[in-house]
Swiss-Prot record:
It is an enzyme of class 2 (transferase). This is Malate synthase G. The modification Cysteine sulfenic acid (-SOH) is found at residue 622. The gene is glcB. It comes from Mycobacterium sp. (strain JLS). Pathway: Carbohydrate metabolism; glyoxylate cycle; (S)-malate from isocitrate: step 2/2. Signal peptide: none annotated. SUPFAM superfamilies: Malate synthase G.
Length: 731
């Protein structure tokens, strides 16, 4: 039984109450009693509206399901369908032209295009690594990944391989030629660096010194001039590059110019995630996340890290200080990524707080209140709050996921306004990032943005969740195409193009981020370097990466592409059509061979089991899960949603049977067990699937997938994780 504290109409779990009262409120000017009274009033006032919005989702879905069932025979009539969606209010009127007016936004969001990390906030080590990923070693990122091939004796091995190192150096030199070119010649021939009359000069041999083609790219240096250990700071497209020189270092001693590393400004922004990448089902889990968020904002989060036989304490990096080119002043740059926090959406409740009748309170309301409170510590430097700030403009950046349409965005805006009143913050301090990952938001994106025109700081596409909603919305329309074919569908390109077009049309360029989705293949960095440049070329000022290393590699793309120049080329264009956006990804004909159907079912069942077993048994919400071909993929609830919804759709339309699903799950459980055999804490599923809560959760996600709200996986996952935790506690 959870120990609770009575706060007006609310019953707050003791662990949460004590943390907020004793830790989160400390160092603010807020009175605890007044704060908790404000929490009570916000919950009481806004809960009915949240419930109404969820009821509206259900009502629209029921009408769409009925419409499709009535037209099960015969071809899909696109015009009739569009008219129907308009009549029921699913498609809303265009709000007309406008420009967003969000003010007080940090440069990292408004004018600096670069990578964005998303990291589970419940894991302190991951959170610290991500916050510190503002700067990353290009040499390390190249040496440790497949961007540098193993050919010609360049294998990684257990010790430094000079052949591989030379390949890294050559690659980095070529990158510098593109990002900060010399007036003549190439960095590949550099034998020395110096500063003369406030300008960088590079020796190309035989005492031939050349400057930069763009002298203004040199913005600072560290160390004493003439010292063997120093560095040069360059800037290109708003991002910084630091060339570290130390001829006595192991790498520098092998380099004819003494360069030991090239450091890139990498993860310009990071999302600390309370949503799809975490498994937070109760007060204990929520407090862990809130405490880490507090440490990040106060600047005192730390974690003991062991590597081999060494243990050290990881902390947040300080800011970086350089001498200006003429030697007369200082330039200070942020040492850490600018932090967003992603709250949960409008659907879920959490028993960290209940009302007087025992009903769980909406988790999104809790998150807004508590992450907003905690973020106050990141707005100022003081003895109580620590030496590090997050925002330098006094803003709090909250990503709000899984909103369906403008009314839900308007509700978020009103919720944030109420939170500001409770916290004593100026109106519009809490900024909102809108995830464009639900179909009704995509179709009404401009109206969604208008509802938050004075708070919005980003829009971001999320292909996997968006596909999950695409399938669920049209569950009754017929069987969908295979998962791998989704990316080639007309609605996908229209979706990605429209997000950029609408963002530009509403004034995002220079004011807010236009974001694109995650690279999920964590080990295939050569492919990422080749392909992910397409996102900035499409107008994205940021795109998601799965690791600090990936952030450094993806940062190269923003040196190769001037995104704000791309915006000028795209402004005024409307590349996406509503007809394409409304094209349902139905299979034209069921021409799959039995082995193709089995392959699709097995692929999805294996993916579901591999993710769910770690969610349920280990409380891990974001995993590097090997697929059926043993390729490591970054999985979170979004990938689970699309896999479970596709199989639920095929089950609904008779492409597969319930027995097909159960048979595949049992077969794939053995595969997942084998893939996790080296994990001493892993509990095998295949030996007794009926008693494995994780296996039963995976099966339920498919068999009951058609009836889950919007196809979301959270209700089943949360219930099953609580069941597992209770079974362990009672053992």
């Amino acid at each position: 039984m959870t120990d609770r504290v009575t706060v007006g109409n609310l019953r707050v779990a003791r662990a949460l109450y004590d943390f907020i009262t004793d830790e989160a409120l400390a160092g603010t000017d807020l009175d605890p009693d007044s704060f908790w009274s404000g929490v009570d009033k916000v919950v009481t006032d806004l809960t009915p509206r949240n419930q109404e919005l969820l009821a509206r989702r259900d009502d629209l879905q029921a009408q769409i399901d009925k419409w499709h069932r009535q037209r099960a025979i015969g071809p899909h009539d696109a015009d009739e369908y569009k008219q129907f969606l308009t009549e029921i209010g699913y498609l809303e009127p265009d709000p007309g032209d406008f420009t967003i007016t969000t003010a007080g936004v940090d440069d990292e969001i408004t004018t600096t295009a670069g990578p964005q990390l998303v990291v589970p906030v419940l894991n302190a080590r991951f959170a610290l690594n991500a916050a510190n990923a503002r700067w990353g070693s290009l040499y390390d990122a190249l040496y440790g990944t497949d961007v540098i091939s193993d050919e010609d004796g360049a294998e990684k091995g257990t010790s430094y391989n000079r052949v591989r190192g030379d390949k890294v150096i050559a690659y980095a030199r070529e990158f510098l030629d593109g990002a900060a070119p010399l007036a003549s010649g190439s960095y590949a021939d550099a034998t020395g660096f110096r500063i003369e009359d406030g300008q960088v000069q590079v020796e190309l041999g035989d005492d031939q010194w050349v400057g930069l083609a763009g002298p203004d790219q040199f913005v600072g240096y560290t160390g004493e001039l003439g010292s063997p250990q120093w560095s040069i700071l360059l800037r290109n497209n708003g991002l910084h590059i630091e060339i570290l020189i130390d001829p006595d270092s192991p790498v520098g001693s092998t380099d004819k110019a003494g360069v030991k590393d090239v450091v890139l400004e990498s993860a310009v922004t990071t999302i600390m995630d309370f949503e799809d990448s975490v498994a937070a089902v109760d007060a204990e889990d929520k407090v862990l996340g809130y405490r880490n968020w507090l440490g990040l904002n106060r600047g005192d989060l730390s974690e003991e890290v062991s590597k081999g036989d060494k243990t050290f304490t990881r902390v947040l990096n300080p800011d970086r200080t350089y001498t200006t080119p003429d030697g007369s002043g200082e330039l200070t740059l942020p040492g850490r990524s600018l932090l967003f926090v992603r709250n949960v959406g409008h659907l879920m409740t959490n028993d960290a707080i209940t009302d007087a009748e025992g009903n769980e309170v909406f988790e999104g309301i809790q998150d807004a209140l508590f992450t907003g409170l905690i973020a106050m510590h990141g707005l100022k430097e003081s003895d109580a709050n620590g030496p590090l700030r997050n925002s330098r403009t006094g803003s709090v950046y909250i990503v709000k996921p899984k909103m369906h349409g403008p009314a839900e965005v308007a509700y978020t805006v009103d919720l944030f306004s109420r939170v500001e009143d409770v916290l004593g913050l100026p109106q519009n301090t809490l900024k909102v990032g809108i995830m464009d990952e639900e179909r009704r938001t995509t179709l009404n994106l401009k109206a969604c943005i208008k509802a938050a025109a004075d708070r919005v700081v980003f829009i971001n596409t999320g292909f996997l969740d968006r596909t999950g909603d695409e399938i669920h919305t049209s569950m009754e329309a017929g069987p969908m195409i295979r998962k791998g074919a989704m990316k080639s569908q007309p609605w996908i390109k229209a979706y990605e193009d429209q997000n950029v077009d609408v963002g530009l049309a509403t004034g995002f360029s220079g004011r807010a981020q236009i974001g694109k989705g995650m690279w999920a293949m964590t080990d295939l960095m050569a492919d990422m370097v080749e392909q992910k440049i397409g996102q900035p070329k499409a107008g994205a000022t940021t795109a998601w990466v799965p690791s600090p290393t990936a952030a450094t590699l993806h940062a190269m793309h923003y040196h190769q592409v001037d995104v704000y120049a791309v915006h000028k080329e795209l402004e005024g264009k409307q590349r996406a059509s509503l007809d394409d956006l409304l094209t349902i990804p139905l299979a034209k004909e069921l021409a799959w061979a039995p082995e193709e159907i089995r392959e699709e079912v097995d692929n999805n069942c294996q993916s579901i089991l591999g993710y769910v077993v770690r969610w349920i048994d280990a409380g891990v919400g974001c995993s590097k899960v090997p697929d059926i071909h043993d390729i490591a993929l970054m999985e979170d609830r979004a990938t689970l949603r699309i896999s479970s919804q596709l199989l639920a759709n095929w089950l609904r339309h008779g492409v597969i049977t319930e027995e097909d699903v159960k048979t595949s799950l049992r077969r794939m459980a053995a595969v997942v067990d084998e893939q996790n055999a080296k994990d001493p804490d892993f509990k095998p599923m295949a030996t007794d699937p009926d008693s494995s809560i994780a296996f039963q959760a995976a099966q339920e996600l498919i068999l009951a997938g058609g009836t889950q709200p919007s196809g979301y996986t959270e209700p089943i996952l949360h219930r099953r994780r609580r069941e597992y935790k209770a079974s362990v506690a009672g053992a």
